[in-house]
Regions:
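Flexible, glycine-rich linker and terminal segments associated
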Residues: 40-95, 101-108, 113-115, 121-217, ...
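Acidic Gly/Asp/Thr-rich repetitive segments characteristic of extracellular carbohydrate-active
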Residues: 208-242
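N-terminal extracellular ligand-recognition/capping segment immediately after the signal peptide
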Residues: 230-271
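Glycine-rich beta-solenoid repeat tracts in large extracellular/virion proteins
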Residues: 247-250, 274, 289-296, 312-318, ...
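Right-handed parallel beta-helix/beta-spiral solenoid domain characteristic of secreted/periplasmic
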Residues: 256-311, 356
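All-beta strand scaffolds that present successive hydrophobic residues in beta-strands
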Residues: 256-257, 301-303, 321-325, 344-348, ...
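Right-handed parallel beta-helix
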Residues: 297-383, 387-394, 403, 411, ...
């Protein structure tokens, strides 16, 4: 008696398990054995065998399945011949028997038939040692399911070395160590299961009681309407174009399914998925520009159509639960798809081409998008690609393409919720993405605008929401433009390359966060702020290799500008062309720019300018006009080709302290205009190619304090003070290693 547990992975990657048991009776001349096999009866899928087709007026499917068989086999064997006359200890045995395997599931035929085999065995071979064995075997079996099967086998048994020489076994002892003979496999079979109803995988609708429409259908629009609620209508293009002068009006829950397309259907019982196709794809043409070719209803679906002409290819009003999928819509007088009212449904994988080109119309127009999905669509050569007439308050608009449209790729009036992500807009006549009103919420992320004739992304204002991970590439105007105030929200991780300006802000910045954005190789400014910054955070942005300034600011009176980097720009790294009267400007870096590293082109009257670095710039590290207040502290200018800190106009107030100017080719600190007030203290000028400090004049109603500064190893004077003296601090300024005037 014996038992085994078997595990098998089939060619379809299904795992099966079985237990087997048996017994055998052996003598010198005879063999008799019986085996039984009990597998797991669980059905496994074979998707490659799934099939779907029309049966009567229904679409049905049969699921491919694989099952293991239970069964038994037996055989009787006899010694046929020995070979005493040869030098080999050998025998020849023959076996006959049969097998029976079955599974009671529908469609699985029993597997039964005869089996015969023969074995030639050689024992105790001199070159392999006592206990060795070589067996040559052949087997043949036949059944109606698998047909004729033949196998051959060669086995070699070699004894392992032990203590001393092994002894030869007797003939009966050798029989007791024969391998157990059983079916080592788990018997499997694959069939298609019974017919079952099918559902459209896309919507879950059962595909039954079909109505068929083709070019020969009389009064097809009435036939379509009469099919009723939740009906399925199959359009077949085998007989040519289906023309309509009145349009097809959907019932609630009705499905219009086009032939000639392969769609996924799901078995109602098995859950298996099969591909279904029928006939040819139809072209449904609206012959009048005053009618909509299809008018949708709630829960209705249209799949796979080629729709041409009409006023709108598809129209709907206040729809929910609908599906528009894999249609091609072209040549509509107005819009490919036009949906009025509040819209919540699914619009996926459609193509809109050449719609609305004689007017300002669109591939897809939605009035209010409140939920659902608009994804995977392509809109090209229309007036506008995608047009949201009023508001996006929910849902997802993702992975759509707008290209070669006459005007904007995406026109969005306003956005208060939902997400717009992963879309591409390129080669359009106006903007890639245009927002007509303030963005107050939602997520706008990972979109691409490239090679558009105007702006890549053209926003109005931003009061909330997130704009992140978008790319503006090679657009004729600014990559990102904001034409109203920024009061809130987050603008982060966006990239602008090879545009006019990279990022353009036309109005005030009062709040929000602008962080981690990159502007590179744009024709003009990397970041251009045309009006006031009075709040919010602008941080960790990068401007490299732009044709004009890396960062161009106007007035700055509040908020934080920190940890930004400007490198290799054509003019200034960072420039303020308006007054700095408040806020914090800190931790910024400007290196290798073609003019000044950081330029303040108007009055500094307040705020804090601290811990910034300007190095390796072609002109000054820091360039200031008049200083009337504020704090300029702990900044560093090093290795610039002119002055480290250049003060071009009167200093009458404020604090300039703890700054470092080293290794610049001009003065460390250059005060060309009168110093009339303020505090200049604890600064260090070292290793500059001219004097450490150049002061043209302490003059006016002088209240200046010039104290505890240091000048070290400058090529000319440590302190070059031409006229006058500060109100306080003379004698506190020190230095060493300068050509002269180490102390002041």
């Amino acid at each position: 008696l014996y038992g085994f547990y078997d595990v098998r992975r089939s060619q379809y990657s299904n795992i099966f398990r079985q237990g087997s048991f048996g017994f055998e009776l052996l003598s010198i001349e005879w063999d008799f054995r019986v085996n039984g096999y009990v597998p797991s009866q669980k059905q496994q899928r074979v998707d490659s065998l799934n099939t779907a087709y029309v049966s009567g007026n229904n679409i049905v499917m049969r699921a491919g399945e694989e099952r293991a068989y239970w069964g038994t086999d037996f055989e009787v064997g006899r010694l046929l011949k020995t070979f005493p006359e040869s030098n080999l200890d050998a025998d020849l045995r023959g076996y006959v028997g049969g097998y029976y395997f079955d599974n009671s599931a529908p469609g699985f035929k029993e597997i039964t038939g005869p089996r015969a085999r023969v074995e030639y065995r050689m024992f105790d071979l001199p070159w392999l040692g006592n206990g060795s064995r070589v067996v040559l075997a052949g087997q043949y079996q036949y059944d109606e399911v698998r047909g004729s099967q033949g196998t051959g086998l060669l086995t070699v048994r070699i004894p392992l070395p032990g203590n001393g020489d092994s002894q030869k076994l007797s003939r009966f002892q050798r029989r007791m160590v024969n391998p157990i003979v059983r079916d080592l496999d788990i018997v499997l079979n694959q069939v298609r299961g019974p017919e079952e109803c099918a559902k459209l995988q896309l919507t879950g609708q059962e595909l039954k009681d079909l109505t068929f429409i083709d070019a020969d259908t009389v009064n097809a629009e009435a036939v379509f309407s009469a099919a009723g609620t939740d009906s399925v209508v199959l359009f077949d293009g085998s007989k040519g174009t289906i023309n309509t002068s009145t349009g097809y009006v959907f019932n609630d829950g009705q499905l219009a399914l086009a032939g000639g397309n392969s769609v996924n259907v799901v078995g109602c019982n098995s859950g298996a998925v099969a591909r279904f196709s029928y006939g040819a794809q139809p072209t449904v043409n609206g012959s009048l520009t005053s009618i909509d070719v299809f008018t949708m209803a709630d829960r209705s679906s249209i799949v796979g159509m080629n729709i041409t002409g009409g006023e709108n290819g598809i129209y709907g009003n206040n729809l929910s639960g609908f599906t528009i999928n894999r249609n091609t819509i072209s040549g509509a007088d107005e819009d490919g798809v036009h949906l009025d009212g509040d819209i919540n449904g699914t619009i996926t994988d459609n193509t809109f081409t050449g719609n609305g080109v004689t007017g300002y119309n669109d591939g897809l127009e939605v009035q209010n998008f409140t939920g659902g999905t608009i994804s995977g669509n392509v809109s090209r050569n229309n007036g506008y690609g995608y047009y949201i007439e009023n508001d996006i308050s929910g849902g997802t608009i993702s992975n759509n393409i707008a290209e070669n449209n006459l005007y904007d790729g995406f026109y969005i009036t306003k956005m208060s919720g939902g997400s717009i992500t992963g879309n591409t807009s390129k080669n359009n006549g106006n903007d890639g993405f245009y927002f007509d009103d303030v963005m107050t919420g939602g997520v706008f992320s990972d979109n691409i605008a490239s090679n558009n004739d105007e702006f890549g992304f053209n926003f109005d204002g931003v009061n909330g929401g997130t704009i992140s991970g978008n790319q503006a590439l090679d657009n004729a105007y600014a990559g990102f433009a904001f034409y109203d105030d920024i009061n809130g929200g987050t603008i982060s991780g966006n990239i602008a390359e090879r545009n006019d300006d990279g990022f353009y802000f036309d109005e005030d910045i009062n709040g929000g966060t602008i962080t981690g954005n990159i502007a590179s190789n744009n024709r003009y400014d990397g970041f251009y702020f045309r009006d006031e910054i009075s709040g919010g955070t602008f941080s960790n942005n990068i401007a490299t290799d732009n044709g004009d300034d890396g960062f161009d600011f106007d007035d700055f009176d509040g908020g934080t500008i920190s940890n930004n980097i400007a490198t290799g720009n054509g003019v200034n790294g960072i420039a303020f062309y308006g007054e700095v009267s408040g806020g914090t400007f800190s931790g910024n870096t400007a290196t290798g720019n073609q003019d000044n590293g950081i330029k303040f082109g108007d009055t500094v009257s307040g705020g804090t300018i601290s811990n910034n670095l300007a190095s390796g710039n072609v002109d000054d590290g820091f360039d200031f006009e008049d200083i009337t207040g504020g704090f300029i502290t702990a900044n560093t200018a090093t290795g610039n080709q002119d002055v480290g800190f250049d003060f071009d106009d009167i200093v009458s107030g404020g604090t300039i302290s703890n700054n470092i100017a080293s290794g610049n080719q001009g003065y460390g600190f250059d005060f060309i205009a009168p110093i009339q007030g303020g505090t200049i203290s604890n600064n260090t000028a070292s290793s500059n190619s001219k004097s450490g400090y150049f002061v043209n004049i302490f003059g006016g109603g002088n209240t200046a304090s010039f104290t505890n500064n240091s000048a070290i190893d400058n090529a000319l004077k440590g302190y070059d003070v031409r006229t006058g003296a500060p109100q306080s601090g003379v004698g506190t300024n020190t230095g060493s290693g300068n050509a002269s005037d180490n102390n002041y």
